[in-house]
């Protein structure tokens, strides 16, 4: 404790603030945050490998982009995959896998939310994977100049289930949600599906967007009361169980969170 007080006295000063921020960002990476990139760099490939070994029957990919996540599941298991992607350019690339996996891959050019209709989706043409339904996207400094948008069809998973009742006879292993800050609304619009079909895993991307929407992991955990909370690390096959009530697990930095059915 005395040693900590000495460090406090030396470094808890405005002079060292910028240096301390750099150190904080480094520590956050060591804690599993901010590992952007492909499935391997984020650690998702290790999680997906685990899923595929469990012989999944149905996986749902929301915010499928160009299909890397869906493709991995299709290539490494016999699971059916339902993929949703609202951006037309990305959807066309995603749809190409339909030719190879026509009996197991079902693609939909629409966004998933808590309401049905049509909505603007804001996009950076150079980085379409950053596209979001939320106007809060412009509060993030690297997206503040985003002016382009498309109008897309918006659906809910509950409504999708009503029109695809064959899913009621199947077991959903995984729902993956990567919607750039819109994850909470997706889950709100899937309450009945989650209640009836009890998917084993629900994966969300948790990031800076949620700060501006006042949605933290604790709020997600209250919505998914029957699920335990875990975190993906980039170099570990195992998931780390975390306590969503703890502030150290609620940093608004990029991470992949897994909700596992209790």
Where on the chain are the PLM-derived regions?
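Phosphate/nucleotide-binding beta-alpha loop and adjacent structural elements of enzyme active sites
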Residues: 1-262
